From Swiss-Prot:
L-isoleucyl-5'-AMP binds at E561. It is an enzyme of class 6 (ligase). Zn(2+) binds at C899, C902, C919, C922. It catalyses: tRNA(Ile) + L-isoleucine + ATP = L-isoleucyl-tRNA(Ile) + AMP + diphosphate. The gene is ileS. Monomer. This is Isoleucine--tRNA ligase. Belongs to the class-I aminoacyl-tRNA synthetase family. IleS type 1 subfamily. It comes from Coxiella burnetii (strain RSA 493 / Nine Mile phase I). A motif ('KMSKS' region) lies at residues 602-606.
Length: 936
């Protein structure tokens, strides 16, 4: 048998079938760096409309984990897609560098007490730099393009100085206030915590009912209409923090609730109890009392001003009115310790009650506190409960499990503790109302983000921005020692401090002698040594980065972070921006869910489910991780596991194989010389170009709307269905067997060229390494990188009419039914390959009209050796119906010989003496002018 291999146009390409991403990706990275790709993109896009995705700074501590890898990948997809859309879309990465975790790491390594404050801060700075280098390497290895040589760091001297300037503007605009307010306090940190540093965990706590005795029992009884009685009156409170009782200054009742006077016997003594009417039964059940009488009821506002004796201190406390009182649990009477709770603080403020805080920064009672002096607060619960029991004031005690605030770093329970702190006042100058109004102007993705952050802002207390730590940006203020007022020239003084910090770091403030700035006034002022909350540091990036860097702008087009940032960075950025310039720093905000395992559990060493991005990159490649990130629905929790990553790897392989097919059939195609005019294209090729163009419109729209899973699905389906199992399958015969430079082959190559040009750009934002690798093998002159181009727009006008589109859709369905039937016959051993089969299609008028247009070329669409069509009502006994109404099939094994070149079984094989083992079509294609195709 003659070998006709040399007469075929077999695929050729140096583009490797095996991706070998872990080895090949670093080579691409090196090429990007040699090319200075990021700078080239910036130069190429100069003068184009800006699109700014502002990078929320990750914390400079530890290697990148899967959450931060997911974050940076999504951002990179957005930025690259906007670049392909023609925008100038710079990406300036940043890092959050101050705060407790870095302090703790340095303290652990070097010890805090062994170093001066300045040396300790320098050690923190050095540690943060080392962590930034690690994370920078991790992010670059993921293929994230950005200004990695010039990131913003919140510890850069210039950034620290600008943060002080931002604070100065907030001071000048009247948003800063000082107060002794209760804040979340971590005894282990020795500092206040921000809302975003608080996490809730279950905790076992004592729940006690404590009786406060009315000083004038007779007056109380008379208010309830009870006369001629001598029984004492108790007002029971219910609390899970008995340790706060030394700080009690009042008992709160709700003005509109109804309260009952309940007569009973407790501890073998008659007693009257004042309880919220709705809670009488549950309270008496708790006290183990079945026999009791209700004597009248009053609304809470009638109880205001009644005097009560503190249960163990020589202190008279009033009943006051508070809207925060509920009937969800307890007694309807709320123990009020203004130093240990925000609601307590606010209600006490109305009554001008003292803020009595007996707890120090270490979470211990100050030494002269009655009974519990020097004790840690949680250990003080027990002696207080014992004392209450001994004095007859303890009505009930039990242990309950409840959700309780904990330090995000130490995982230890927090306390509310009143300390002198600096706050951004939510109700000063209408900040809260302006924030709520601005939230409505922002586009929130998903849409529920608006309600979430709106509720948080509506409910949040004043923002405590001060911390008592060493490693941070100072709050450079002077307070008058007598009046407590800020220096009248504070903003101007802060600018001078900012200039010093810009040259010498934050040490300049801590080392500063006040006389340098204040002269003789220095003796009258106290220098503030607190530092700023790290959420303030990162919250003013709009001022310190977006506003200051020439290539950026404010407001940013989008902020993109995890949904936990509704109470973190999104909020701190919004509030500082409004306090400075009275508008939001972003036009839109996109959030994603936490990265969890396949069972919805958080990543944890104890569960053994931690997957490190470095391991994924090392084993599968960054592009597989990027494809996983794009494929996930980020609006909910994002699942990851080895199995899920394997599926991403399989999908990647299909995409790569499609690209390889395209490239391997364009090896001899020169777009300048070989492109076929649209009016000469084979109909199937025109359909393929039109389908590609239509899909591109959908893909670009999906990129614009950040619908990455839809893009992933569209590309995956394109590779496996419309292209992989239909178009590319059909044209193989034409590509391989038609005349090398003949119209049928060049028509197919023209379509493949357009498909490849579009396809490589579609995948570029997602699997960037692979796209740029493909780009190097594409035919024709081109830029050195796909990222220096835009979406492909040089499509010919291959538009199809609605009728033509419908016809091809029907042909897709018909071919699918034929394929299923052939597969069944193959599995049953009735045929070998599809080319051993001859197919008769029995079609109704509608389908017949479509199929008949293909004529002799029907067999090429079905990839069978012979195919014919007959009316549906002429079905033979051997025919069987399909799932497509109006279509039946009959499949027979061809009786003809196989062509040695195209492998089709044709009656013409053996008919041409000089080429007895070839069909007439192959003789024409190999040795004569070649066949012509019109449809397929």
């Amino acid at each position: 048998m003659t070998d006709y291999k040399d007469t075929l146009n077999l695929p050729q390409t140096d583009f490797p079938m095996r991706a070998n991403l872990p080895e090949r990706e670093p080579q691409t990275l090196a090429r990007w760096q040699t090319l200075d790709l990021y700078r080239k993109i910036r130069k190429d896009r100069e003068g184009q409309p800006k699109f700014i995705l502002h990078d929320g700074p990750p914390y400079a501590n530890g290697r990148a984990h899967l959450g931060t890898a997911f974050n940076k990948t999504l951002k990179d997809i957005v930025v690259k897609s906007k670049t392909l859309s023609g925008f100038d879309a710079p990406f300036v990465p940043g890092w959050d560098c101050h705060g407790l975790p870095i302090e703790l790491n340095v303290e652990k390594k070097l010890g805090k007490d062994k170093l001066s404050a300045n040396a300790f801060r320098q050690a923190c700075r050095d540690y943060a730099f080392s962590q930034i280098e690690l994370q920078r390497d991790d992010f670059q290895r993921l293929g994230v393009l950005g200004d990695w040589q010039h990131p913003y760091l919140t510890m850069d001297f210039g950034y620290e100085a600008d943060t002080v300037r931002a604070l100065a503007k907030i001071v000048a605009n009247g948003h800063l206030l000082r107060g002794q307010k209760p804040v979340h306090w971590c005894a282990a940190c020795g500092s206040a915590l921000a809302e975003a540093e608080v996490e809730y965990r279950d905790k076992a706590s004592p729940a006690v009912d404590v009786g406060f005795e009315a000083v004038d029992a007779e007056a109380v009884r008379q208010r309830f209409g009870v006369k001629n009685a001598t029984t004492r009156v108790l007002v029971p409170i219910w609390t899970t923090t008995p340790w706060t009782l030394p700080a009690n200054e009042a008992v709160s009742v709700h003005p509109e609730l109804h309260y009952a006077l309940v007569k009973s016997e407790l501890q073998n003594q008659p007693v009257y109890l004042i309880l919220a009417k709705d809670l009488v039964d549950s309270a008496m059940q708790r006290y183990g009392v079945d026999d009791y009488e209700v004597h009248g009821n009053l609304k809470g506002d009638a109880l205001e001003g009644m005097q009560l004796q503190h249960p163990f201190l020589d202190r008279i406390v009033p009943i006051i009115l508070g809207e925060h009182v509920t009937t969800e649990a307890g007694t309807g009477n709320v123990h009020t310790a203004p130093a240990h709770g925000l609601e307590d603080y606010f209600v006490a403020e109305k009554y001008n009650l003292p803020i009595n805080n007996p707890v120090d920064a270490r979470g211990r009672f100050i030494p002269d506190t009655f009974l519990v002096g020097g004790q840690p607060v949680f250990k003080a619960n027990e002696p207080i409960i014992v004392l209450l029991a001994d004095s007859g004031h303890l009505l009930h005690s039990e242990t309950i499990q409840h959700s309780y605030p904990h330090c995000w770093r130490h995982k230890t329970p927090l306390i509310f503790r009143a300390t002198p702190q600096w706050f951004i006042g939510m109700n000063k100058n209408g900040l809260r109302e302006r924030a709520l109004a601005e939230i409505e102007k922002v586009t929130w993705l998903p849409a529920w983000g608006e309600a979430r952050i709106g509720k948080m802002v509506a409910d949040r207390p004043d923002w405590c921005i001060s911390r008592q730590r060493l490693w941070g940006i100072p709050i450079p203020l002077f307070i008058h020692k007598k009046s407590g007022e800020l220096h009248p020239k504070s903003p101007a003084l802060m600018e001078k401090v900012a200039q010093l910090i810009e040259k010498e770091s934050v040490d300049a403030w801590f080392d500063l002698d006040p006389k340098v700035l204040l002269g003789d006034d220095a003796d009258h002022y106290e220098k503030v040594t607190d530092v700023l909350d790290v959420w303030f540091d990162s919250g003013v990036t709009h001022f310190c980065v977006l506003e200051k860097r020439r290539e950026l702008k404010v407001p940013a087009d989008i902020y993109l972070e995890g949904s936990d940032q509704h109470r973190g960075w999104f909020q701190s950025s919004l509030l500082t921006s409004l306090a400075i310039r009275d508008k939001a720093p972003y036009k839109s905000v996109l959030t994603y869910g936490f990265v969890v395992d396949s069972q919805g559990r958080k990543m944890s060493k104890s569960l053994g489910n931690v997957i490190l991005p470095a391991d994924v990159v090392k084993n599968l490649g960054a592009d597989v991780l990027r494809l996983w990130a794009a494929s996930m629905d980020y609006t909910v929790e994002v699942n990851v596991s080895d199995e899920i990553l394997k599926r991403a790897s399989d999908a990647y392989r299909r995409i790569r194989n499609t690209a390889r097919f395209l490239l391997s059939n364009l090896y001899d195609f020169d777009p300048k010389k070989d492109k076929v005019a649209v009016d000469q294209l084979v109909a199937l090729d025109r359909w393929a170009i039109f389908t590609t163009q239509k899909l591109q419109e959908k893909i670009i729209t999906a990129y614009d709307r950040y619908r990455f899973p839809a893009i992933y699905q569209a590309i995956h389906n394109f590779c496996t269905v419309e292209m992989g199992s239909f178009y590319l399958d059909i044209i193989k015969d034409r590509l391989y067997t038609s005349k090398e430079s003949g119209l049928p082959r060049r028509s197919a190559q023209t379509a493949l060229y357009y498909i490849a040009e579009a396809f490589v750009r579609w995948i570029a934002p997602i699997i960037s390494f692979t796209a740029d690798e493909i780009w190097q093998f594409m035919p024709g002159d081109r830029e050195p990188s796909v990222f220096l181009t835009q979406w492909f727009s040089d499509f010919p006008n291959a538009a199809l009419s609605g009728e033509e589109e419908q016809r091809w859709q029907l042909l897709l369905q018909i071919r699918d039914e034929v394929n299923k039937a052939l597969e069944t016959y193959r599995n049953e051993g009735k045929i070998g390959s599809a080319l051993t089969a001859e197919v008769v299609l029995y079609a109704d008028e509608r389908l017949n009209a479509v199929i008949a247009t293909l004529g002799e070329e029907l067999r090429f669409v079905l990839i069978t050796s012979e195919a014919s069509v007959l009316p549906f009502n002429e079905k033979s006994k051997a025919a069987f119906d399909t799932a497509l109404p109006g279509l039946a099939l009959e499949i027979n094994v061809s009786e003809f010989e196989k062509c040695a070149r195209c492998w089709q079984r044709r009656s013409s094989v053996g008919q041409i003496k000089e080429h007895a083992d070839l069909c007439d079509r192959c003789v024409s294609n190999a040795f004569e002018d070649g066949e012509m195709r019109q449809f397929a």
